[in-house]
Amino acid sequence: MITDCFEADIAIPSGISRPDAAALQRCEGRVVFLPTIRRQLALADVAHESFVSGGVSPDTLGLLLAYRRRFPAVITRVLPTRIVACPVDLGLTHAGTVNLRNTSPVDLCNGDPVSLVPPVFEGQATDVRLESLDLTLRFPVPLPTPLAREIVARLVARGIRDLNPDPRTPGELPDLNVLYYNGARLSLVADVQQLASVNTELRSLVLNMVYSITEGTTLILTLIPRLLALSAQDGYVNALLQMQSVTREAAQLIHPEAPMLMQDGERRLPLYEALVAWLAHAGQLGDILALAPAVRVCTFDGAAVVQSGDMAPVIRYP
């Protein structure tokens, strides 16, 4: 456990009942999303009701978009009057680890990058209802990042299908609701009903894909002559060029002339600047469909596999 780190105190109202206080005691290791990083916060600031906008409760994709605007924090202690949470972005910059409860239906392995997604699995409830305070705590599910990306991609596909339904295949597609991970069969029951979040995800996805495809094709057409010149000396480049690629064959047949760019005293040929920008942009394309990893599992002397329900020591993802 880390020491001497930034901690946020979430005040528990005095009117809480004993059963609700006991329910909060079992929330150690869960993750809450802070609207701002401050020393003092109210419990209502991290409750599910704080995500409601315009009187409408967000669905699964809406929660994902809201997660990106907030700061994840791991609950380290639950005291009678306050909850102590350690913000991942700030508190874990010091040396050490914090314990994260594995509430997912799959195991977390040492070294796994972990992403946080809303509850999406059948038969799984992560809500803690505090009747005396009229508040609900809906905790995210920590998942290995590859699994989280596949789940969110399926959710976006479901939303796109609802946005533009196919009359030939009415109803839901069962293949979108079932996936397999490490031999386990997982069923999705996520709520995707509001089209605003689907439109936001779809717009970002399409714009990024169009940019990446257009700029990437331009870079390939520009680099093909140089790759052909290197193919006689580099075996890897030669094998790469021997691949039956439509883009490669089209570039060899068409071989368009590179546009003559205006040069001035402070500007070089922007090919490599464009390549760097495209690589950075392509790397961000995956983050559009899922949250970036928040933490990484790091077990020192314990078991390398953390089962569902157990505590997993985690460090801040680099």
Curated annotation (Swiss-Prot):
Question: Which keywords describe this protein according to UniProt?
Answer: Capsid protein, Host nucleus, Virion
Q: Name one GO cellular component term.
A: viral capsid
Q: Which Pfam families match?
A: Herpes_V23
Molecular function via GO? structural molecule activity
Q: What is its main location?
A: virion
Reading the lineage from the top rank, the first entry is Viruses
Which family does the entry's similarity section mention?
Answer: Belongs to the herpesviridae TRX2 protein family.
Q: How does it assemble?
A: Interacts with TRX1 and major capisd protein/MCP.
The protein's name is Triplex capsid protein 2
